[in-house]
């Protein structure tokens, strides 16, 4: 799987909106539905990891 390289605007755990590159992106979809893409991000201030929704046109990577 290729590494993620495009930045996405997300809200961090502290509530700030920043542009981050996800560590990994995967698809969550229940049977028979479209689903959403979720990314794993690391907060630059605290170093903690969190998940956030990414746009549907973002490639699956990680």
UniProtKB/Swiss-Prot annotation:
Post-translational changes noted in the entry: Methylated at multiple sites, to varying extents.
GO molecular function, one term: double-stranded DNA binding
Keywords: Chromosome, Cytoplasm, DNA-binding, Methylation
Pfam families: Cren7
InterPro entries the record matches: Cren7_sf, dsDNA-bd_Cren7
GO cellular component assignments: chromosome; cytoplasm
UniProt function note: A chromatin protein, binds double-stranded DNA without sequence specificity. Constrains negative DNA supercoils.
Oligomer status and interactors: Monomer.
Protein name: Chromatin protein Cren7
